[in-house]
Amino acid sequence: MMRENPELLLGQVLGDSLRFVSIIGAGAYGVVYKAEDIYDGTLYAVKALCKDGLNEKQKKLQARELALHARVSSHPYIITLHRVLETEDAIYVVLQYCPNGDLFTYITEKKVYQGNSHLIKTVFLQLISAVEHCHSVGIYHRDLKPENIMVGNDVNTVYLADFGLATTEPYSSDFGCGSLFYMSPECQREVKKLSSLSDMLPVTPEPIESQSSSFATAPNDVWALGIILINLCCKRNPWKRACSQTDGTYRSYVHNPSTLLSILPISRELNSLLNRIFDRNPKTRITLPELSTLVSNCKNLTRRLRPAPLVSSRYLAYQQQQQQQQMNLQQGIQGYPHQGYMPTQNIGFPWPPTPQFVSNWNHCATPTIPVSLQVLTPNSSLKVDPTTPLTAPIHATESFWPSAAAAAAAVHNNANSYMPITPTPYPNNAKIFGYPNQPPLTPIPFTGFVLHPAPVGRAADAVDPSRKSL
């Protein structure tokens, strides 16, 4: 009954003292209610877990979650589990009420942490303390992410929550457990096979630990904390997946530990700290006590990142010479259906491209501009998604692609949209257009390698199903 009509419980009293006031949220697990103590007015969050349709394994997992949460509930930065009540059709978990919701909302919508090093350090040290307490009693969270962290009555306090994937095993064979953005490399034993052109790229092999039969759960939590720290500082994720074989940005980081410093508004101090957190060898990865000390002593976490132009100064003179051709092309393209997107930056060049253009890999100088690309040639067009394989027009010449790939890799990708456009061909010209569209917490594409061709019309990669809708 509760699963089909959760509103029926509103106004009713649970356990002789808790009146259901409103619904906070709902999911496959059940419903979370806001409840009020009828005697003293104290507010609680009550998670109603459905019992109907659960098999024995699911019931054991449900019981394990509650038992593990209860063991660490007394910590000041972990959501308090007050008591558990059970009826014929549901289990009611009475929890500490946090009216401000989760950290994900505060990072992406309210934006109170970005640029505030003191506030970031305050809440991040609280998270370290909470996770360190869990580890001290032999509990490993395995699903650390902003969605599972609640914000207190003010933004200076946060609480760790949701122990649904927690374990007492220091080593686990549950590869892929957690949320993809926050998984360590060793937690991702299964990797996709490289495509033919990607195989030619210089890729550093994954560490031996990532190929073993199990992975250490404590260092895996440390890795996730590092991603959360970047979320707090920059309002985005550094990569989609910590796999050098399938993720370009992470591959760049493996080859050059200064990659994040060049594409994120972080300080050199924080970059050095992140290098310790993102040590691919879990045995030498920074420990939580070390992490707490270094964060406490870090003076500045962020820095002001000066925006760079999409078109480099070296190419600007050449572009000005082609101004008339660009204006003609611009007048023609205004008739296309852009679905609300307007070009903000562009690169124009003659078709077929000159050897000077092809040899210049600096047409686009920055990966920080939040745009997607439209590449036009006299024969065809495509929408470029820089974090996925570059889609080549059927009639494009091979000499065009090094420069086109460099341009595509130098801009920010919006993986959640796909914008097909069919323009009219323009003789003797080609052009790359940028379109603004920046979702929160999206990965930053790697710049440096030629992206390999893929079938025309490929859609954007699917987003991590564990993420909230943005």
Swiss-Prot record:
SMART domains: S_TKc (SM00220). This is Negative regulator of sexual conjugation and meiosis. SUPFAM superfamilies: Protein kinase-like (PK-like). The keyword Transferase applies. This protein is a negative regulator of both sexual conjugation and meiosis. It phosphorylates mei2. It blocks the onset of meiosis until conjugation takes place. It catalyses: L-seryl-[protein] + ATP = O-phospho-L-seryl-[protein] + ADP + H(+); L-threonyl-[protein] + ATP = O-phospho-L-threonyl-[protein] + ADP + H(+). Its EC number is 2.7.11.1. Keywords: ATP-binding, Conjugation, Kinase, Meiosis, Nucleotide-binding, Phosphoprotein, Serine/threonine-protein kinase, Transferase. Belongs to the protein kinase superfamily. Ser/Thr protein kinase family. Residues 18-295 form the Protein kinase domain. GO terms for molecular function: ATP binding; protein kinase activity; protein serine kinase activity; protein serine/threonine kinase activity. One of its GO terms (biological process) is signal transduction. The keyword Nucleotide-binding applies. The active site is at residue 143. ATP binds at residues 24-32, 47. One of its GO terms (cellular component) is nucleus. The modification Phosphoserine is found at residue 469. Transmembrane segments: none annotated. InterPro entries: Atg1-like, Kinase-like_dom_sf, Prot_kinase_dom, Protein_kinase_ATP_BS, Ser/Thr_kinase_AS.
